[in-house]
Every structure is written in C-alpha cells, then in structure tokens.
C-alpha cells in the first residue's frame, strides 16, 4: 500500500530541510514495488511560489487549506527566521488537526517552533537545531528539549536536529517502514551514513579544533581525515607533518598530550 509523506514549507524555508527528507523517500521508490511507493506532497503556508533562505524557489503542490487528507507522515521544515515567525491562528488550527489525523508527524531542524506554536509539543521530549534549543525551551517550557540529539521519537512525534539531521530521521523512518536493507540502499545512493543513531551528538568531533591550525597535530589530523580508508603508519603520518618518525612522535605527544594512536581517535 502506498504511503503518503507531506512536508510543510513557507517563505524563507531552509531548502535542505525540504530536499533532504524528500530525496530519501523519493530514492526509496527505486527499491520498492509500485504498490509500496511513497507519494510526496508539499504543502504551502502561502499560495504560489516561495523563496527559500538560499534563494531557490519552491512551489507547493497545495495550500494548507486544501490539505485535508490523512498523511502517513507529516513533517514541517525549518528556516533561519522561523523562530521569529507566526503564521496565525488559522494555520495553527489546521496544523493541529492535520497532525492529529496523521499516523506520524514531526519537524526538521527548527521546524519544531511551528509545532510548538500550535501546541503540539506540550509535555513532549523533542530536539531541534542546537543553536535554537534554548529559545525553544523558553517558548515551550513544558517540553523537554534535548539539545544534543540527532533526532528524538516520542510516541507519534518525531523531531530532528539541524538541517542534515532530517536525512538521518528520514532514513530511520524508512527503515521502520521497509527495513534496514532498503534504508542502506538509499543511504548508498545519497552517499550518506546509515545510520547515525538518534542519540548521537549533533556536534561532530571533526568540527572541533583540537590543535593550532598550523601545528603538526592539525596537519596530521587533516591528513588522516583525507585518508580514512588507508592503512596509515607512523612513517606516513610523520611524512605528512614533514618530520622524521622519531621527532614526529615526540612533537605529537608534546602538542597532543597523548600518544599518537589515542590522539588520532579523539
């Protein structure tokens, strides 16, 4: 049986919040029988074309007032200005009713603010983009906002962290629908990890500076990241730092305050 996935968009929406999840479910159709295909629906807060935050233009399939069906999954996207936007009581009422009808509903990135303003996060455990977590907790004080989670499942409610975490959430939901093998096939098509778990930190260790950018430690860390599949030796690493192996080990221990093997894993 076909499954319907809808995503709500608005002027200023983050394009990747929309295209990431939609690509997961669209690519899944390559591996599914026609009768199991996902049907995708883009619902607009406004009619006509809407500019994304990056300048791309989206055209919704229908205005929210025309979206009265029961969706298997209803998602709301986020955007840089969404925490400051209010779409009015008519939209909020529609969103409450639509989410109440849906088998599952949720948000991508700070789309959680849209759900919060409609009263859909009261008493729930959720996540959002790390940069907006404090503001969401203030807006919806009865919610438990877990700022350092990629995605959170609370009953029928699914919320994801910032931007690309929407892909992780979508892969998780795809695996729930059709199994891990299909989700893995889609992840391979999209060249992404499958599957970063919901409890994994939003903060990548590779985005955290561990050493001065011109130091031997930093040079070697960059070299390792560029050669993750290689069988690297101390000699290789020393060469990347333009040092002898002996001197490299001494310098690396001094700057990294740990043996080479331990420091590279940090």
Residue ranges and their predicted role:
Residues 21, 91, 111, 132-135, ...:
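Internal, well-ordered alpha-helical segments in soluble enzyme and binding-protein domains
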Residues 206, 219, 223-226, 230-266:
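Basic/polar phosphate-binding segments, predominantly the helix-turn-helix DNA-binding elements
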Residues 177-222, 230:
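Accessory alpha-helical/coil subdomains and C-terminal extensions
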Residues 149-189:
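Conserved anion/nucleotide-ligand pocket segment
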Residues 122-150, 185-186, 190:
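A conserved active-site-flanking secondary-structure segment within enzyme catalytic domains
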Residues 1-117:
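N-terminal functional module of multi-domain proteins
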Residues 33-40, 144, 178-185:
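A short alpha-helix-loop-beta-strand transition element characteristic
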């Amino acid at each position: 049986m076909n499954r319907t996935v809808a995503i709500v968009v608005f002027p200023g929406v983050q394009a990747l919040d929309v295209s990431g999840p939609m690509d997961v479910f669209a690519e899944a159709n390559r591996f599914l029988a026609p009768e199991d295909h996902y049907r995708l629906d883009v619902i607009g807060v406004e009619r006509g074309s809407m500019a994304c935050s990056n300048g791309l233009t989206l055209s919704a399939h229908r205005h929210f007032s025309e979206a009265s069906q029961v969706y298997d999954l209803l998602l709301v996207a986020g955007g840089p200005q969404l925490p400051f936007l209010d779409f009015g009581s008519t939209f909020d009422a529609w969103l409450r009713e639509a989410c109440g009808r849906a088998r599952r509903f949720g948000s991508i990135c700070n789309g959680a603010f849209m759900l919060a303003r409609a009263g859909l996060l009261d008493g729930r455990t959720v996540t959002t983009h790390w940069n907006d977590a404090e503001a969401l907790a203030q807006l919806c004080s009865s919610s438990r906002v877990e700022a350092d989670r990629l995605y959170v499942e609370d009953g029928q409610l699914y919320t994801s962290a910032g931007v690309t975490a929407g892909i992780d959430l979508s892969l998780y939901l795809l695996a729930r629908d059709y199994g891990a093998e299909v989700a893995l096939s889609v992840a391979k098509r999209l060249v992404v990890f499958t599957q970063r778990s919901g409890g994994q930190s939003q903060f990548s260790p590779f985005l955290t500076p561990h050493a001065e950018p011109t130091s031997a430690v930093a040079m070697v860390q960059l070299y390792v990241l560029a050669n993750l599949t290689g069988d690297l030796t101390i000699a290789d690493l020393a060469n990347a730092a333009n040092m002898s192996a002996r001197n490299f080990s001494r310098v690396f221990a001094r700057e990294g305050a740990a043996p080479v093997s331990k420091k590279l894993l940090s």
